[in-house]
Design a protein with these regions (language model features):
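Single-stranded nucleic acid-binding surfaces, predominantly the OB-fold ssDNA-binding core
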Residues: 1-100
Length: 100
């Protein structure tokens, strides 16, 4: 399943950004964002992935608790565990960030 939708969220980082590099030395940063939705008792959590120069800037300007705007596409990802069980998760592939 690879469902895609474009979204814009505002929230706060749940932990410090994690910067890594692909085999081709392309920077990729991952972090989670907690978005408070009016009428909901607990925040909605988003897994965010950022690529390229923006990924490197995330580790400079962001830390746990930082407010941020994120715009991008949601992707439903699927993987198989070591036990053979199929699992899914949603990931926001960010193309526009607003450091606040």
């Amino acid at each position: 399943m690879n469902h895609q939708e474009r979204i814009l969220i505002y929230g706060r980082l749940g932990k410090n950004p994690d910067l890594r590099y692909t085999r081709k030395q392309e920077p990729v940063c991952q972090f989670t964002v907690a978005e408070n939705i009016e009428g909901e008792s607990s925040p909605r959590w988003h897994r965010v992935v950022v690529w390229g120069k923006q990924a490197e800037l995330c580790t400079v300007y962001l830390k746990k608790g930082s407010p941020i705007f994120v715009q991008g596409q949601n992707f439903d990802r699927e993987f198989t565990t070591d036990e053979g069980e199929k699992k899914q998760y949603r990931e926001l592939n960010a193309d526009n960030l607003g450091f606040l």
